[in-house]
């Protein structure tokens, strides 16, 4: 079988587990995809590392502070010429997707497209959190979902370094398994769950993650 034709590079790891017997965790779909969106944005700005170090990093921190994330900051990575940044929780990531003005830092059409990717992903994710999802809504989600992933990896048009070249967005290699699942399989899961009178948002590890966070915090509290 040619798995490439099915949108897969390799055979399924667990072919014995049918699609109807498992559900992706909606929390980690959001967390890991926002990690990709933020990473693509920050690393593009780090292409001019001197300018990033001199002013851009501070401006981004100020923008984060403007939307209420006053603890956000960049710090030098162990990888030379790179910076890491403060880890954000789910609520904070949703705040960034909704309110951070990407176009302040990436000008022109590219900045608008990048901001669209953030806002549209937020809209699609919030759809998954709705109580009542209709068949029509799932169909609309599926079309918008596929359009979103295609815009993410929109190719460069025109000859390299030519005046008419239109720079694309990100590489297909930047697409992660979570993004593949989001774009290619979530509508299928929505239909399966709807037929069973279940909701996608109920399949979330958010409560477990919160409990784990509290346990870790308590351990660290008594460590010092």
Segments from the language model and where they lie:
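A structural signal for the principal folded core domain
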Residues: 1-224
């Amino acid at each position: 079988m040619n798995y490439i034709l099915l949108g897969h590079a390799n055979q399924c790891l667990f072919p014995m587990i049918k699609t109807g017997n498992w559900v992706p965790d909606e929390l980690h779909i959001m967390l890991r995809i926002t990690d990709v969106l933020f990473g693509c944005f920050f690393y593009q700005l780090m292409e001019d590392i001197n300018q990033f170090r001199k002013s851009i990093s501070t401006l981004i921190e100020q923008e984060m502070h403007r939307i209420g994330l006053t603890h956000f900051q960049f710090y030098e990575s162990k990888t030379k010429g790179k910076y890491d940044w403060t880890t954000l929780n789910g609520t904070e990531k949703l705040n960034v997707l909704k309110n951070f003005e990407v176009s302040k830092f990436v000008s022109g059409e590219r900045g608008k497209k990048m901001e669209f990717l953030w806002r549209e992903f937020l809209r699609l994710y919030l759809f998954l959190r709705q109580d009542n999802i209709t068949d029509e809504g799932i169909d609309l989600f599926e079309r918008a979902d596929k359009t979103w992933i295609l815009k993410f990896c929109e190719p460069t048009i025109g000859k390299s370094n030519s005046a008419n070249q239109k720079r694309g967005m990100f590489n297909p290699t930047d697409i992660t398994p979570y993004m593949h699942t989001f774009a290619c399989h979530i509508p299928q899961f929505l239909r399966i769950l709807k037929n069973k009178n279940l909701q996608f948002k109920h399949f979330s590890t958010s409560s477990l993650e919160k409990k784990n966070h509290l346990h870790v915090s308590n351990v660290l509290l008594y460590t010092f």
